[in-house]
């Protein structure tokens, strides 16, 4: 999954980032959750390695990814990029990987260690997001790709 915050003219950078993940055998998007931020010109990438490599079988095609970008872009504008959107996106990713867990409550499911790492990253992401709100050049568009 990629959660991307940036300005409207950063779409090409996002696509380039996706292509790098597609053609890199050691960094498949559904195996690694990459959170890519553009906040005041600073990019922060946090990776969580998912131990369950069977998730690679669920990997979507490039066309599917591009369709998701187009569909989610309009939805995110309506949601006004609230902090809860980050939580929802991560919960959706956990469900798609077959882990019956909720990052806001107790962690359950077959991949407990991976889920605990994701839960820790959620806290980091929330902190970064909260700090970015008070900065100039706040991101205006969010893309969520699962």
Curated annotation (Swiss-Prot):
Q: Which range is the signal sequence, renumbered to this chain?
A: 1-24
User: Which residues are reported to be glycosylated?
Assistant: 99, 106
Record has Glycoprotein as a keyword: yes
Query: What does the UniProt keyword field contain?
Result: Glycoprotein, Signal
* Additional information: Partially overlaps HXT14.
Q: What is this protein called?
A: Putative uncharacterized protein YNL319W
Species, as recorded: Saccharomyces cerevisiae (strain ATCC 204508 / S288c) (Baker's yeast)
Lineage runs:
Eukaryota, Fungi, Dikarya, Ascomycota, Saccharomycotina
């Amino acid at each position: 999954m990629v959660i991307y915050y940036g300005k409207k003219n950063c779409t090409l950078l996002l696509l380039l980032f996706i292509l790098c993940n597609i053609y890199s055998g050691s960094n498949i998007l559904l195996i690694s959750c990459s959170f890519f931020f553009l906040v005041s010109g600073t990019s922060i990438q946090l990776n969580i390695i998912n131990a369950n490599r069977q998730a690679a079988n669920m990997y979507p095609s490039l066309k599917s990814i591009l369709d998701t970008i187009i569909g989610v872009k309009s939805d995110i504008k309506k949601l006004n990029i609230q902090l809860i959107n980050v939580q929802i996106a991560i919960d959706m990713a956990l469900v798609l990987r077959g882990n019956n867990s909720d990052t806001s409550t107790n962690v359950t499911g077959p991949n407990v260690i991976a889920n605990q790492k994701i839960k820790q990253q959620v806290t980091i992401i929330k902190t970064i997001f909260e700090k970015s709100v008070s900065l100039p050049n706040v991101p205006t568009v969010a893309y969520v790709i699962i």
